[in-house]
A protein has these predicted regions:
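Catalytic domains of riboflavin
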Residues: 1-4, 484
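Hydrophobic helix-and-loop "lid/oligomerization" segment in the mid-to-C-terminal part
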Residues: 2, 10-11, 15-143, 163-164, ...
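Mid-to-C-terminal polyanion-binding domains and interfaces
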Residues: 75, 79, 315-319, 326-359, ...
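Active-site cavity-forming subdomains of large catalytic enzyme subunits
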Residues: 134-203, 207-216, 226, 243
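A short acidic, amphipathic alpha-helical/loop segment
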Residues: 155-159, 357, 372, 481
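A generic local secondary-structure boundary/capping motif
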Residues: 157, 194-197, 275-276, 374-375, ...
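Histidine-centered active-site/metal-ligand motif
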Residues: 172-173, 365, 424, 517
Length: 589
């Protein structure tokens, strides 16, 4: 299916700001536009963006309830109370549990007073459970701290309070209009909150708690630095924004991982075949993060926490091997379920017409539903919900969005059909009784049909282009400037550029085992620039037209090809078309 191309449009004021920024910073005009698109309007903001400083982290006490939470936690430490840290089973939850555990342990709180609980994905389900509260009661716990969960746990928190336990919630999910009766609720998305940055991960909220605790106990900020590696993992894997405060966390966290990683991260790096000092966002997304996530998907998230709090090499090595095996099992399972799910859609014309794809098979493993939903959303360019049997009469579902569709809002609109749900615009999870599924499917499809952005060419994938370049602007100098935006991630993706009126410079050819890819050697139509190299996955069908010297346009990311013994600028082509096809491809935004 051909993609449409949308070039980001800038207002007159934005163009003026972009031009002024680029001029003052000595950058290409396109870089000025990229900065403005990321909310950067002044020279000072640009300096902070390019050189994030820990001194620019926000005051934790600007968060509602922080003083109450810090005082309660400090009292628990001083009086040697039993504390239970309760976290979700994904990377954000397990890193948040490990962060609090490691810091409290470092504050000389004996481990006999320090406990953690991760719900079992299969037996407990998502969120705070009464089983978890009862576990805390058996341990004599007087303070529970939930991380990456708890913002909707009204019944469970009430139950804990009735049994003499105080409760601090550290969560980043969108709350309802009313809040549960906790001792303190730390959540930057609270409606009454004035904290300057709303896009913290669950682990990020936990970090703000220990930042406040360190301030209360007159401890230097340096005591918090070893925890930054956990923040990097959570921010990357939970796909929260990496602008603002998260950019500070992730920039300094990557420096830490590449200079002084913990023993846990060291062994994960070995399993992922990542050289010391070479950890980047890609290696976190595809090597470290999936291994940590695999325990909660295939067995129990507590196995990940055991690794992340390990202090000795023997424990770290053993636990990392366990997670690696879970990850291998997860890969096999998600590939199998993905094949089955794709076959269901492709064999059902009715499913292919739906604005939102919903698939249910009782035998599918709950642990891979989110991965499968993401794969299908990418393939079919629509939001996808995957459901399977959970326990008793209940089904569990996981969804991923596409095309700007707000999946959380769609599920919330049908929430009276559900037992519980949670998530955000891009991803969500839910629990539903099996007999309510038909009504839920009907209503969420009606909601999807009613949403304007899904009714206008809903099935056409769209490639978002950050800026159009003149062929003469495509250079190693621009690549070096683009790399100043690193680290890349949510809200700061690697820029996609477009240029037009390119022609073959000799050497363009189909490559690959099945000759399905395209290796490009190109110049502008007037041959005024030195030939550029490009590589396009799956676009070899254009080779005959290009080698006949037909003009073409292309969308691409800039990268360095370090193919030994030489290094050269390469355009990683996202899409291309003949110049004659361009008017049909381009749309405005």
């Amino acid at each position: 299916m051909s993609q449409s191309w949308e070039i980001r449009q800038y207002t007159t004021d934005e163009e003026t700001q972009a031009c002024e920024l680029a001029t003052r910073l000595g950058l290409f005009p396109a870089m000025g536009r990229l900065l403005v698109a990321r909310g950067i309007r002044t020279y000072e903001e640009a300096q902070s963006f390019f050189s994030p400083r820990l001194e620019e982290l926000h005051d934790p006490f600007a968060m509602e309830d922080m003083l109450v939470a810090v005082e309660r936690l400090n009292r628990a430490i001083e009086q040697r109370e039993h504390i239970l840290i309760y976290g979700d089973y994904d990377v954000d939850g397990t890193t948040a549990v490990a962060l609090l555990y490691r810091y409290l342990r470092a504050q000389c709180l004996p481990e006999e007073y320090l406990h953690y609980y991760i719900p079992d994905r299969y037996d407990d389900g998502y969120g705070i459970t009464l089983q978890g509260i009862d576990y805390a009661r058996q341990l004599g716990v007087s303070l529970i701290i939930s991380v990456d969960t708890g913002i909707k746990a009204f019944e469970e928190i009430t139950y804990a309070r009735e049994h003499g336990m105080d409760f601090i919630v550290c969560d980043h999910h969108t709350p309802d209009d009313s809040l549960p009766p906790a001792t303190a609720i730390l959540n930057p998305k609270r409606h009454d909150n004035h904290y300057p940055f709303t896009e913290l991960s669950g682990c990020g909220v936990a970090f703000k708690l220990v930042q406040g605790l360190a301030s209360r106990r007159n401890l230097p900020f340096e005591t918090l630095l070893p925890l930054l590696e956990l923040l990097v993992l959570s921010i990357a894997q939970d796909r929260v924004s990496i602008l603002g405060e998260n950019r500070i966390f992730i920039s300094h966290g990557l420096q830490l991982i590449n200079s002084h990683p913990s023993v846990a991260i060291t062994y994960l790096m070995r399993l992922g075949k990542i050289q010391p000092g070479r950890v980047d966002m890609a290696s976190i997304y595809y090597e470290l993060g999936p291994r940590i996530n695999a325990a909660g998907r295939m067995a129990h998230g507590a196995e990940s926490v055991k690794l992340l709090i390990a202090e000795d090499a023997a424990t770290a090595e053993a636990q990392s091997q366990i997670l690696d095996e879970y990850n291998r099992q997860r890969q096999e399972l998600d590939q199998q379920v993905t094949r089955e799910a794709i076959a269901l859609v492709e064999s059902d014309p009715q499913l292919q017409k739906q604005r939102l794809i919903i698939l249910y098979r009782p035998e599918w493993n709950k642990g891979v539903m989110g991965i499968v939903a993401a794969r299908l959303a990418d393939r079919f360019h629509r939001p996808v919900l995957i459901l399977s049997h959970s326990t008793g009469d209940f089904l569990a579902g996981s969804g991923r969005s596409a095309g700007g569709f707000d999946l959380y809002q769609a599920i919330q609109a049908c929430s009276d059909c559900l037992e519980n749900f949670g998530g955000h615009i891009f991803a969500a999870g839910l629990t539903i009784r099996e007999d309510r599924l038909p009504e839920f499917m009907r209503r969420i499809q009606e909601y999807a049909d009613s949403v304007e952005q899904t009714t206008s060419q809903p099935f056409t994938p769209t490639l978002q282009i950050d800026a159009e370049l003149k062929p003469s602007e495509v250079s190693r100098t621009l690549l070096r400037q683009v790399e100043m935006l690193y680290p890349f991630g949510t809200d700061n993706e690697r820029p996609i550029f477009m240029t037009r009126n390119m022609r073959d410079a000799g050497g363009t050819r189909a490559v690959g085992k099945a000759l399905q890819h395209l290796s490009l050697r190109m110049t502008d139509s007037y041959q005024r620039i030195r030939p550029l190299h490009g590589f396009a996955l799956g676009l070899a069908r254009y080779a005959p037209e290009i080698t006949r010297h037909n003009a073409f346009a292309l969308c691409f990311e800039l990268e360095e090809n370090n193919f030994y013994p030489q290094s050269f600028l390469q355009l990683r082509v996202k899409d291309l078309c003949l110049e004659s096809e361009l008017p049909e491809r381009l749309t405005d935004r």
